[in-house]
């Protein structure tokens, strides 16, 4: 059944009672009439609200896969006066049960991104539905089903577009009050109580009929008087219980009875985004947030996941053809030109973007692996050019791909059905590949007859192919007589996903010809030969990192890098499994390495690895480079080669082959 609240009936002669007829007609998308009803109404006052119930037994429910909408035509007749209105609506019921989200009795999982009100041509949001069909359609194309509007409520066109596309929206007031952003906290101003209560009620009244409006938060990262937020939430929820409510987006806090869910980066004091557990995530593909789910009494949504800085594409300056001037990108371009790295910008974008995509995948899969997790919200699929410039997106601020991943590639790990693979990342040839297989299964229908099709490749060669209904793998790696990187693809029906693992041969420790003092360095340059120059003799020692700058190197001042470019074909790396960009086999090496600045226009210095500088620092550095000096060929190595790990042993072996002239 459907409960309809009719429009307020305004009678201009309140002293006089009258009567009229209300006629309801419901049509489907094709215009077919699916329900009709006529009711007599007595009018008593200048304004009244009547309730009517229309049976609609065969109604199709609205959701992300079948966003069915109906049109209600309401006609009121009173004597010779006639008034008529049309309202679009969808049938759906959102609820929480056992700490899970249910839409019409079926569990849903949120895969979201955040809209931070970026409009580079106008400075304000479009008011036509077509523009939002394109903008929101991009999120849908990338496999997402959810958009959170960060500290703002979008216009009618957004809800209409989301209704049509089948997107689950979270809406907020323009409420972002905490001292960290240099504004008062909630309740510091007496006007907060009346203004924000009325704002929340107005949002509910204006947009409440839209089926896409599933979630409401008072605002972003609010601190202060939570009793005021509780009053607002309780009041609005009592009037309109058709959606779910939370006090604020972000900040773990004692949950109140009016809250249906928690959106934060910590839940019950457990992290729910990889930022706070990168070392654990680097060890394997098994990280999840089960402890947070167990200890939190409501569904948990991980807040602002990602925020991995990608080097900016300043070529977008030419695209600002409207009211906005990109003075931030103009400044970035000027700094890059002054530092002599502007011509490398596309290489920097590719390298930093590749790392960001890898880390976004890890963040997303950790959420998908977590049983009964509420979902995640990325920050963000697109760049955010405010707050001192945060180019954290795989798409630019115009919503265009940076060429890092296609939508289809992104959907493989962020869509409604995603195969998952839990295993270590680094093995030796004496071990077995032990892995657990599972399926994140939130498609239109549950997957039947689950079968995993597993293919493991080394380059183009198939190392192993297995079809199994068992969710476990136990594969010997002893047939490999060399170190290798293996690509594991797990397919279930038409859905597939891939991971890279690294297998290191049982390599003995290698002694490297090394110069230890400035005098030894000077001598070999005179006599000739090859030798390793350790970090102690670097002209400067700049710390390296694997995880890129968080959010923005301007907002959070940092000299950290944003990825690394690798000359994988260089002879010094012929024995070390790597591609052109860093993967997890490099994490421990890079985080214990130092680099030196690459001199401008010095062809004697040939970087094998080049750190991608952040756009505020723009200092190109290298932890591993060949330097031709005098008669010598010197291998400057900033890696700590003392740990007895498979990766270090293999890198030393590979470097040793180069220094000995074997490659």
What name fits each language-model region?
Residues 1, 5-150, 161, 165-166, ...:
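Secreted/periplasmic carbohydrate-active enzymes, especially glycoside hydrolases
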Residues 88-100, 286-291, 376, 516-520, ...:
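Short acidic, Pro/Gly- and aromatic-enriched capping/linker segments at domain boundaries
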Residues 102-103, 207-210, 292-296, 525-526, ...:
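Extracellular/periplasmic catalytic domains that process cell-envelope and extracellular macromolecules
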Residues 109-114, 300-304, 511-516, 631-639:
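Active-site-proximal beta-strand elements of phosphoester/diester hydrolases
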Residues 146-396:
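Substrate-binding/catalytic cleft of secreted carbohydrate-active enzymes
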Residues 223, 252-253, 306-309, 382-385, ...:
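Short, solvent-exposed loop/turn segments at secondary-structure junctions
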Residues 512-552, 631-633, 637:
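Short alpha-beta junction capping motif
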Residues 537-540, 552-647:
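Catalytic beta-strand/loop cores that center a nucleophilic Ser/Cys/Thr
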